[in-house]
UniProtKB/Swiss-Prot annotation:
Class of enzymatic activity (EC top level): transferase
GO MF assignments: protein-lysine N-methyltransferase activity
GO cellular component: cytoplasm
Localization annotation: Cytoplasm
Organism: Syntrophobacter fumaroxidans (strain DSM 10017 / MPOB)
Reactions catalysed according to its record: L-lysyl-[protein] + 3 S-adenosyl-L-methionine = N(6),N(6),N(6)-trimethyl-L-lysyl-[protein] + 3 S-adenosyl-L-homocysteine + 3 H(+)
Keyword Phosphoprotein included in the entry's annotation: no
Main location: cytoplasm
Protein name as catalogued: Ribosomal protein L11 methyltransferase
Biological process according to GO: methylation
UniProt keyword annotations, A-Z: Cytoplasm, Methyltransferase, S-adenosyl-L-methionine, Transferase
Binding of S-adenosyl-L-methionine, residues: 136, 162, 184, 226
Superkingdom of source: Bacteria
Length: 290
């Protein structure tokens, strides 16, 4: 890979980074890195649309007027040699241990697991979670802890709402949750999740559904959703309905400052708030259904 690459850094806060990343990834068909100051993505200088800058500025302008009124999204551009880009990009994505025994590992990396490790094979792509984001790590750690707490029994059934890359569903199946359903209303997310489920040999262990949580059938011992605060509030009644009696709901994608709003919405529908986990500005809320 000897051509040049265009590196684009977009400054944005953590409360909007997922939305900005998803919009840009969908438009340009690229992988997006989450960084402390915002997001970064790359375009092949040889094949990038000639009007990529106009397209980018239009997206950012629209997001700052309609989606997030008053917000601004400044960006900067750098040029990288092909070899530098390839090496740097792969250097950024190394095997990532989350919790005690979950390891998210890119397919190009060789990894010698420790006893008891469960390997999630997943390459970065199209802005969906690969374990780098704090909320994904919070959810993975919670799933592992829940599976350990259930021993010697199996941890029960699980529904992953807004599955994205499918990483939480794959982790759940590896940890012994059964049956596992995963649902997403974004067609691209469903495509990516299907690829990752197959990559991990989990086609028979995970039922993947296209649509909203309403497409899920039954009630689950665990409902997990790593989305955002506002959508979580909007779908509260549906997620409460899908949580089995004595079951747990684990909700993330929530800024710490938004935690009380989400907690109130689910408490008002009868769920009992239990624990809150935090990582940086983000939190995971755990509820139990009586």
């Amino acid at each position: 890979m000897n051509g040049e690459w265009i590196g684009i850094d977009v400054a944005c806060g953590p409360d909007v980074a997922d939305d900005v990343a998803a919009e840009l990834a969908g438009t340009f068909g690229v992988s997006v890195e989450f960084r402390s100051t915002g997001i970064r993505f790359y375009l092949d200088a040889g094949s990038a649309p000639h009007d990529w800058r106009t397209t980018l500025e239009g997206i950012l302008r629209e997001m700052g007027t309609r989606r997030f009124p008053g917000a601004s999204f400044p960006y900067s551009v750098s040029t990288l040699a092909g070899d530098d880009w390839a090496d740097g990009w792969k250097a950024y994505f190394k095997p990532l241990r989350v919790g005690k025994h979950l390891v998210v590992c890119p397919t190009w990396e060789e990894f010698a697991p420790d006893a008891g490790d469960r390997i999630i094979r997943m390459d970065p792509g199209r802005a969906f979670g690969t374990g780098q984001h704090e909320t994904t790590r919070l959810c993975l750690e919670w799933l592992e802890d829940r599976a350990l707490q259930a021993l010697p029994s199996a941890p029960g059934s699980l529904l992953d709402v807004g599955t994205g890359s499918g990483i939480l569903a794959v982790a759940a199946a590896l940890l012994g949750f059964h049956p596992v359903q995963a649902v997403d209303d974004d067609p691209e997310a469903v495509e990516v999740a299907a690829e990752n489920i197959a990559l991990n040999g989990m086609e028979s262990a995970i039922e993947l559904l296209a649509g909203t949580a309403r497409q899920a059938s039954g009630a689950f011992d665990v409902v997990i959703a790593n989305i955002q605060a506002i959508p979580l509030v909007g779908m509260a009644s549906e997620l409460v309905r899908l949580t089995a009696p004595a079951g747990l709901a684990a909700l993330s994608g929530i800024l710490v400052e938004q935690g009380e709003v989400v907690k109130s919405a689910y408490r008002d529908l009868g769920l009992l708030p239990r624990k809150m986990r935090t990582a940086g500005e983000w939190c995971l809320l755990e509820f139990k259904k009586p």
